[in-house]
Design a protein with these regions (language model features):
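Negatively charged
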Residues: 1-175
Length: 175
């Protein structure tokens, strides 16, 4: 499904609910620059075989919320620029449950969510869950203007990603 809807900026609606994605391994740039689309129902997507989700939603300006709670990311090897420049997105449901164990290069999370502002509770949950996975060292994810809860377990998890895993995290700082 590599580049399936790439640069379809004129689309306003898109029904992908009947797509069989059970054998798909590449979703790179699938919805790249679908800037007019305001909602996407991806609840039927089977992503268990997907290896590449880089640039998948880049520049999807019209989206405000994405529900990816059904995504299985255990096989994914790159998520770089996945939500880059999704300036209207204010929540990515399920992102905090992503399995990032398959990421094994320092650039696999580059500019992951640059331009996005996740709710503090979602970003907190992401930091806690991803730190617990003991991820690949040296990554530099950008979480846009997302802010985290200062002090306690969340701040400790973020600090661990930076010190133990040598991550360079860009975000909006303490809420």
């Amino acid at each position: 499904m590599y580049f399936t809807f790439y640069n379809c900026s004129g689309l306003t609606t898109l029904d992908v609910s009947s797509f069989d994605t059970s054998s798909v391994i590449d979703m790179h740039s699938m919805f790249y620059n679908c800037s007019g689309v305001t909602t996407l129902d991806l609840s039927s997507f089977n992503t268990s075989s997907v290896v590449d989700m880089a640039y998948m939603f880049t520049s999807c300006f019209g989206l405000t919320t994405l529900d990816l709670s059904s995504f299985n990311t255990s096989s994914v090897a790159t998520m770089a620029y996945m939500f880059y420049n999704c300036l209207g997105v204010t929540d990515i449901i399920g992102v905090d449950t992503f399995d990032i164990g398959g990421l094994n290069s320092t650039n696999d999370l580059d500019n992951f969510a640059t331009g996005v502002t996740l709710p503090t509770a979602r970003y907190d949950a992401l930091l806690l869950a991803w730190e617990a996975q003991d991820p690949f060292d040296g990554m530099a994810p950008n979480f846009g203007s997302s802010t985290y809860t200062g002090g306690g377990a969340v701040a400790a998890a973020r600090a661990s990603l930076i010190s133990r895993d040598s991550w360079t995290i860009t975000d909006g700082g303490v809420a």
